[in-house]
């Protein structure tokens, strides 16, 4: 019921405000985001873009359910802080003081598109794709120019996992987001992602299911074959 949703959300928000909030931002420990591997102290500890977007989505829904103005205030303050600290007019930071291009911006845009205007998202995606786009139709999990970038999957060795490997779930989410922001401008990227994902599901890995990820250098089925 709506009451149960409201109660669960309220409990969750109160806990997050008490234990996981600093200067209005949500703070996570290392390895607590979906990118849960560490190489050379690269572990995403701190204040991360998609986590803030999810918090903003919680505030937005809670206001819609309760009409309690405090949630609208929480939402507006965090949104303002995000625009001030994360957006430099060209790309949206992956974390506070970390402008390393990563595809987590697409999670943020999917979870809370109100963070920026369509024109701002368009510029953000256009600039970020220069560093993340893989010609076969996927996204690298880190800037292709990063010293941590690895173009071939390293299997159970975590080296390439979130530093090169391309994850199909985030590729497809990116296609949905690009389609929403400007389907004409990003038409080629969207179609390439659809084609690559379709080919992987039908002809590679485990037929009818998406594999976990692909190497950055070429379309392949790696990781769990039925993700």
Predicted regions and their residues:
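Inter-helical turn/loop segments and adjacent helix faces that build the functional surface
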Residues: 1-3, 59-73, 115, 181-184
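Alpha-solenoid repeat scaffolds
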Residues: 69, 135, 184-185, 204
